[in-house]
Regions:
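N-terminal pre-domain segments of enzymes
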Residues: 1-6
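A short glycine-rich, aromatic-capped structural motif
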Residues: 8-71, 88-91, 167-168, 175
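Functional-site microenvironments in short loops/helix caps that host divalent-cation chemistry
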Residues: 19, 25, 29-30, 68, ...
Length: 197
């Protein structure tokens, strides 16, 4: 394993950043019911892509496998090569990871919810966002900001781990099933989500 915050990149593959193992507080007392209770969780080290998957990266998968192109690939507000790919289902995201694994000889997969939250927090403890407790400056103009589609992948400042866009732009998929009360019964170390959902 490389040192935390180090980069790893294969030819034609995503830039990966090492997220160090550690404890953190997961959840939000001010959030939705399924984000409570806040609880202490240990996560082993793992790698995560520095930025969201771009249309250009996903297009390589579509061409190589014959997979169906996402419906917004033809929409000029969503089809710039450097915008993050949108409108793909969970199964398509999993197939993309499997394709990357075969292409680069690794074990690419979607992160678990606990891995995603640890990565998104960027090592900042006790704050609502990686930059502190204040809402994003763009919040008042949220609808206007994304009226013409998402911003280019990687345009946000990096968080404490060197990752970009995890708390802005578009949503990401996690590997876990959903269960509304899972936080109340999840294991303390490396929770993988409920068995079904």
């Amino acid at each position: 394993m490389r040192q935390p915050n180090s980069l790893h990149q294969t030819e034609d593959g995503p830039k990966l950043i090492a997220i160090p193992a550690g404890w953190f507080l997961m959840g939000s007392e001010d959030g939705q019911d399924n984000e409570r209770p806040v609880h202490r969780v240990w996560v082993d080290d793992f790698w995560l892509a520095e930025c969201q998957v771009t249309n250009a990266e996903y297009a390589k998968f579509v061409r190589a496998t014959g997979a169906e192109a996402p419906p917004l690939f033809n929409d000029p507000n969503f089809n710039h090569p450097q915008q993050p790919v949108v409108a793909i289902c969970w199964f398509e995201a999993v197939r993309y990871c499997e394709w990357l694994s075969g292409l680069h000889g690794g074990s690419y997969r979607l992160p678990t919810e606990v891995e995603w939250e640890r990565a998104a927090r960027g090592g900042v403890a006790g704050k609502l966002f990686p930059w502190g407790d204040a809402p994003p400056e763009s919040l008042p103009d949220y609808a206007k900001r994304w009226r013409n589609g998402p911003e280019m992948a990687g345009c946000a400042d990096p968080n404490g781990f060197g990752l970009r866009d995890l708390c802005a732009n578009v949503h990401e998929w996690c590997s876990d099933w959903f269960q509304g009360d899972y936080y109340g019964s999840s294991p303390e170390r490396n929770p993988r989500g409920p068995e079904t959902g």
